[in-house]
Amino acid sequence: MDHLPMPKFGPLAGLRVVFSGIEIAGPFAGQMFAEWGAEVIWIENVAWADTIRVQPNYPQLSRRNLHALSLNIFKDEGREAFLKLMETTDIFIEASKGPAFARRGITDEVLWQHNPKLVIAHLSGFGQYGTEEYTNLPAYNTIAQAFSGYLIQNGDVDQPMPAFPYTADYFSGLTATTAALAALHKVRETGKGESIDIAMYEVMLRMGQYFMMDYFNGGEMCPRMTKGKDPYYAGCGLYKCADGYIVMELVGITQITECFKDIGLAHLLGTPEIPEGTQLIHRIECPYGPLVEEKLDAWLAAHTIAEVKERFAELNIACAKVLTVPELESNPQYVARESITQWQTMDGRTCKGPNIMPKFKNNPGQIWRGMPSHGMDTAAILKNIGYSENDIQELVSKGLAKVED
């Protein structure tokens, strides 16, 4: 297979990935593949572009490194072109409502007829099967959080709150990425394709698993946070200093011992409630939990962030200042690792945003292209799979494809 023009880089060089989906979840999987060197083709509707394009800046990050194909994949010759593309595709990712592709005649079996080794990842809110009440419902970030038990655990004691920005979308996209790569590993061993059913609510069910395990095994559900503090453990979570906020984790025998000396609670060490060797203070079960919080709050409020960080570094207590976004660029760790970077958009502007992650030592990722325009690569992609200029123009004239003006 001849690949589309692009530099060769990263651990996934030579891999062809195609995705169909809008907004964040499915495309985030495509973004990861593209930044790790895969050739990634982004399918958009002919009449309506991906709704993410209305955002002024985010799409320049989320759609960089992609090849844009505008094709009606469910109708007539457009469907034929899509199935021909599948013959040269390693991984196909689609994000839709339940078994939307199967309902429109593009089943796993149809795809495997054209490519027996194809990895197919279906990403939806409620999965490819289940009850009629839920399976075909639309879902976005907050829907998946609410249905999974994740949202109810977040927020404050007075009110649950969804985790932003768009946590369920990003977790689900990463799940699609890792699951597709796991399937591809097996396909290369067996020669038999795989279909993956990724339900966003099940992804978030796993993300919310920590506290749920107590309830599922005969215990009580943990209460929500109070002002950003860990609902289980004292000395863990968000705290206010004299000049701003920090997060900290008071974990470890030595850390607790020395911290208690600083905040005036050394007399509690070695008591039945806080015996020698204590590594965590349970906020609820330990009767001194509220007192620990009261003393720690008072001590932190009397010190600046710099003073707290210096002292906690001496005690080996994990902590960090809560950074504002404007502080990120000048932070020395960000600068040293080039965590924020710049690239050129297709119209020649400079765009700034998060760099590629993670950092591969021997086969690093690369930003080689900005977000393509609607239908920008349609002609090149169709030519790549054997279509002539006349074939392409016929698809365009029938409204089944869009090429760049």
Curated annotation (Swiss-Prot):
Record text on subunit structure and interactions: Homodimer.
GO MF entry, a single one: L-carnitine CoA-transferase activity
Pfam families: CoA_transf_3
Residues involved in CoA binding: K97, R104
Active site: D169
EC number: 2.8.3.21
InterPro entries in UniProt: CoA-transferase_III, CoA-Trfase_CaiB, CoA-Trfase_fam_III, CoA-Trfase_III_dom3_sf, CoA-Trfase_III_dom_1_sf
The keyword Nucleotide-binding is annotated on this UniProt entry: no
Function text: Catalyzes the reversible transfer of the CoA moiety from gamma-butyrobetainyl-CoA to L-carnitine to generate L-carnitinyl-CoA and gamma-butyrobetaine. Is also able to catalyze the reversible transfer of the CoA moiety from gamma-butyrobetainyl-CoA or L-carnitinyl-CoA to crotonobetaine to generate crotonobetainyl-CoA.
Keywords, in A-Z order: Cytoplasm, Transferase
Gene name per UniProt: caiB
Record-given protein name: L-carnitine CoA-transferase
One cellular component term from this protein's GO annotations in UniProt: cytoplasm
Subcellular location: Cytoplasm
Lineage: Bacteria, Pseudomonadati, Pseudomonadota, Gammaproteobacteria, Enterobacterales
Superkingdom of source: Bacteria
Family label: Belongs to the CoA-transferase III family. CaiB subfamily.
GO BP annotations, alphabetical order: carnitine metabolic process
Catalytic activity: crotonobetainyl-CoA + (R)-carnitine = crotonobetaine + (R)-carnitinyl-CoA; 4-(trimethylamino)butanoyl-CoA + (R)-carnitine = (R)-carnitinyl-CoA + 4-(trimethylamino)butanoate
SUPFAM superfamilies in UniProt: CoA-transferase family III (CaiB/BaiF)
Pathway recorded for this protein: Amine and polyamine metabolism; carnitine metabolism
